[in-house]
Amino acid sequence: MQVKSIPYGINFKYKIWGVCFMVNKKLVAAGVVMSIFAGSLVGCGGSSEEGNGGNSTQIYFLNFKPEIADVYKSVAKDYEKETGVKVKVETAASGDYEQTLKSEMAKSEAPTIFQINGPVGYNNWKNYCLDLKDTDLYSHLSDKSLAVTDGDGVYGIPYAVEGYGIIYNQEIMDKYIALSNKKTDITSVDDINNFDVLKEVVEDMQANKDKLGIDGVFASTSMASGNRWRWDTHLANLPFYYEFKDESQDDASIIETGLASDTVEFEYNDNYKNIFDLYLDNSCTEKGLLGNKSVDDSMSEFALGKCAMVQNGNWAWSQIKDVNGNVVKQDDIKFLPIYTGVDGEENQGICIGTENYFAVNSKASEEEQQASIDFINWLFTSDTGKAYVVGDLGFIAPFDTFNEDERPSDPLSGQVMEWMEKDNIKNVNWIFQSFPSEKFKETFNDALLEYVQGTQDWSYVVKTVKDAWKSEKAQ
């Protein structure tokens, strides 16, 4: 099983979808032939009917991303208009996808399309993952090695490349750079290329927050239950990326090193602490209140201009633009790498990869499986579907069905693509798919919360993380 960074496909192909009709042949009386005939025409759109009841097979998609839940519902409506096939879209609460999936899979009408987060996710759900190697969508995947595979089978197809880092508001940064009394000598955000410079700038901005019109440099470090994934997953990716990189022969084997590691040293824990403390100490919210703060709170603070920076990914654009009273201009939203003080980080980029893999339920009926495959294929090959992908969904899709003009229009996805194309920059691979379990992340989070609240010191966090990795790997 292998996961790599995903290139953006530029070749263009368009698949024309045919329309087929089925006629109910059970006629009750000659006098009602025409009315029954008219009422029994059903556009199949690649799916089939269940028995003779005239009800089209329904697709059930369990969505992972709350921030685009409404978009997927619009997608479902348009798909039904074009094909006559209904798509039920349900969305798990933030941080609760795995538990929600377990609950939904136990029901008689289980999801027909769900998401796995890479090799570990596949290992948990391998008995429910259909082999997709013969599907059209897999044939359009730009690099076949990007899929989650097991033997000759393909069980997870990546559908989006994403990136995260420190999102900043260029307008506020320009105000800081123009300050006559600033203690740093930066003349551009480009001068911030390591942790030492970042720390110096952030602390000086915090000291000048009133002049800058902000409550703090960073948005709230959200520590409410279900809202800590930015710290146990995304921020934690960096220290473990560097630890596994030190033990790997090349970049391609970093995630395999993590998957094979029964123990970790958490060697770069001080680097994690560097940036985490910087977030906490220069926030628009006091530490004692962070236990009740959500990701939505953080994004609202940024959108309303209460802070200059927030750690998040390109998916956050929808959260920013939809905030009532948003004051951040689209052209002012940019990415900085998450610098932590690692040697040579001047050439480090943002974190780019994917944890987004579509899987189709192997326990569903053949009709439901085919209908689900057809829907996913439509999303990435039809004009309507692709318009959603590069528009409201904002995906950087890894398929050859998109040409150079079909790129996401939102600023953060555009930033990800710019970082992918920078010379002499090494973006950080996503390797958190190698983390042993959701319980490991929860344990990590609980220790972080105690650290934030001042009831435990940092050494407790380090020990907890190392012990949790070992115990979860032993399961």
Regions found by a protein language model. Name each.
Residues 6-10, 16-18, 23-31, 38-121, ...:
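Conserved N-terminal structural module of periplasmic/extracytoplasmic solute-binding proteins
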Residues 57-58, 82-91, 109, 181-190, ...:
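A local structural motif
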Residues 82, 86-87, 324-394:
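Extracytoplasmic/periplasmic substrate-recognition and gating elements
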Residues 91-100, 193-197, 289-304:
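Short helix-initiation/N-cap motifs at beta->coil->alpha
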Residues 117-174, 332-338:
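Hinge/lid segment of periplasmic solute-binding proteins
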Residues 153-159, 196-260:
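Extracytoplasmic/periplasmic solute-binding protein
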Residues 200-203, 246-292:
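Glycine-centered hinge/linker elements that transmit conformational signals in sensory
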Residues 352, 394-402, 414-470:
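C-terminal capping/gating helix-and-loop segments adjacent to ligand/active sites or protein-protein/ligand interfaces
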